[in-house]
Regions:
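Compositionally biased low-complexity segments at domain edges in trafficked proteins
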Residues: 95-120, 208-225
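Short beta-strand elements
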Residues: 78-87, 188-210
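Short, well-ordered beta-strand segments
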Residues: 75, 126-147, 155-158, 192-193
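Exposed beta-strand face motif in extracellular beta-rich ectodomains
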Residues: 61-65, 110, 174-178
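Short aromatic-acidic-glycine turn motif
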Residues: 90-93, 133-149, 200-205
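Short, hydrophobic beta-strand segments
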Residues: 55-60, 154-173
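Substrate-binding clefts and catalytic carboxylate motifs of secreted carbohydrate-active enzymes
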Residues: 1-106, 119-124
């Protein structure tokens, strides 16, 4: 927990069967945490350890679950919200790559993130369906990982876990267009287009070193994409 600023986080999701009663766990660096369900206060949590607050026997209702953190004087310092996510509506594909581009050096890699989302673009936290990928253009499939036979190594059919997974592709030595398509049962296909950047080569050698283009990060917080 970053103690340089006030933060609050509800562990888990808020999509459960009707009549579910369960504990809710909140991580916060405030002095007290209050839980609200659809605007109604459920009281203050029990402090189990320095950062962990527990709310026992919370009756599930679809909607909005909020944790509000207070300092020692009762002033609000941070809050976090979970909402019930709707039915799966589509796949969302995102490329994560070097800020200076995806280089055609035969070694550069790009991450493909696939998410199952509802109509509002919120990730479906209980979805574990299999996504089928196709790849065309100047890249090679290096795959991802998932629970199952051989952990789906290099498999182009990859299950999501809690609505998300990632796979790697590697550039070829020729710059060009790359098209990735993702399909899953019951959902429309998603398509993503990437373009690799040419790399200067002299006598079979290149002076492009991707590690030199990435800036160091010393700040605290979530890992940046």
């Amino acid at each position: 927990m970053d103690t340089d600023k006030f933060q609050t986080y509800i562990i888990g999701h808020w999509n459960y069967p009707e009549h579910t009663v369960k504990p809710v766990y909140v991580v916060s660096n405030g002095e007290q945490v209050e839980l609200l369900l659809n605007g109604k206060s459920l009281g203050k949590g029990k402090r189990e350890s320095h950062f962990l607050f527990t709310f026992d026997k919370v009756a599930y209702q679809p909607g909005r679950l909020e944790a509000v953190s207070y300092d020692g004087k009762g002033r609000e310092v941070s809050r976090y919200t979970l909402s019930t996510v709707g039915e799966a509506a589509r796949l969302e594909l995102t490329a994560i790559q070097n800020p200076e581009g995806f280089h055609a050096d035969g070694a550069d890699m790009a991450l493909l993130q696939v998410e199952v989302v509802d109509k509002d673009g919120r990730r479906c936290p209980l979805d574990n369906r299999t996504v089928r990928f196709t790849l065309k253009g100047e890249a090679e499939w290096r795959g991802g990982i998932a629970k199952g036979k051989d952990n789906h190594i290099l498999d182009m059919n990859l299950p999501v876990e809690c609505g998300i997974n990632r796979a790697l592709i590697r550039s070829t030595a020729k710059a060009g267009k790359i098209v990735v398509t993702a399909e899953a049962e019951g959902l429309p296909a998603a398509r993503l287009t990437l373009q690799t950047v040419p790399v200067k080569v002299a006598d079979g050698l290149s002076d492009y070193l991707p590690q030199l283009t990435l800036k160091g990060r010393l700040d605290k917080g979530e890992t940046p994409l």
